């Protein structure tokens, strides 16, 4: 193995490690924040997560934005708006349906972007497999809240956009300055949801501490790790790793929230994950053949 190949392999392994770490921290933080929902609700919880996370990131990075280009600002604005909508929808979803089911449905967003990018018969088969997975997860009698499912689909649309926006911010800014600005924009957009709950946080330091932990885990460490992973990985490899997010969510929901995992849930999860891995792998093979 040449030195260049070894460097690339090391870079890929580090990127994969960052992606797995980011997914675990984000889903773990979702399990923690669910216990705050009965007190201040999912919308306010999301808003405080962005506000506290942005404050921590700004304090740590102190981004110098005076010399930012228009392209950098557009990227940060796009990422901030995207994660604001995505997380609001996601928190509304997990307040109504199990964490694993919500993430599996949400994953259809980036999956469809990859699948419909190339309309080959194989890709259509993978779309059918993913569709079967969603039917298994949301089948009549499964007890899933319809509004929660719709919010999960909304979060999926946000996730699809997030992939492009985060890649752009990671490619046009250095360090975590771009992430800090993006999260500040998200905090500003969701600020109205947090205003009415300020008194409760003042009265309950424990609640404020829990939200701070969630903010650090999800935004500072989770999003930060994903950003580092996306900087190091090819889109095809990143796509395969993202397909594992629903499995991580089901595991976290089962271990930390004691959410039941039924046979149909496992079948649905397997269909969605296999479809995601398949469509990503097929795309990467097609790109390699075209390059030769």
Predicted regions and their residues:
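Hydrophobic transmembrane alpha-helices of multi-pass small-molecule transport proteins
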Residues: 57, 108, 122-141, 252, ...
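Hydrophobic alpha-helical transmembrane segments of multi-pass membrane transport proteins
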Residues: 21-32, 60, 77-92, 135-136, ...
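Hydrophobic/aromatic residues within transmembrane alpha-helices
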Residues: 36, 45, 49, 93, ...
């Amino acid at each position: 193995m040449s030195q260049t190949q070894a460097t690339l392999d090391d870079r890929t392994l580090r990127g994969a490690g960052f992606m797995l770490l980011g997914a675990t921290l984000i889903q773990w933080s979702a399990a923690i924040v669910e216990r705050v929902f009965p007190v201040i609700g999912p919308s306010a919880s999301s808003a405080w997560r962005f506000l506290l996370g942005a404050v921590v990131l700004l304090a740590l990075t102190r981004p110098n934005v005076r010399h930012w280009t228009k392209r950098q600002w557009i990227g940060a604005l796009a990422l901030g708006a995207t994660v604001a909508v995505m997380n609001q929808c996601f928190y509304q979803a997990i307040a109504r349906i199990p964490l694993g089911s919500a993430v599996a449905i949400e994953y259809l967003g980036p999956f469809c972007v990859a699948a419909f990018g190339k309309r080959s018969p194989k890709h259509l088969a993978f779309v059918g497999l993913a569709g079967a997975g969603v039917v298994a997860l949301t089948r009549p009698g499964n007890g899933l809240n319809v509004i929660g499912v719709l919010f999960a689909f909304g979060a999926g649309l946000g996730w699809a956009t997030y992939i492009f926006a985060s890649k752009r911010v990671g490619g046009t800014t250095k360090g975590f300055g771009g992430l800090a600005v993006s999260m500040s924009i998200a905090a500003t957009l969701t600020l109205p949801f947090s205003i009415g709950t300020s008194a409760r946080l003042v009265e309950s330091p424990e609640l404020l501490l829990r939200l701070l932990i969630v903010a650090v885990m999800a935004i500072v460490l989770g999003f930060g790790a994903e950003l580092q992973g996306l900087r190091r990985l090819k889109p095809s490899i990143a796509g395969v790793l993202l397909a594992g997010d629903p499995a991580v969510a089901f595991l976290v929901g089962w271990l930390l929230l004691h959410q039941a995992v039924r046979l149909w849930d496992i079948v649905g999860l397997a269909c969605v994950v296999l479809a995601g891995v398949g469509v990503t792998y097929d795309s990467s093979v097609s790109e390699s053949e075209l390059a030769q």
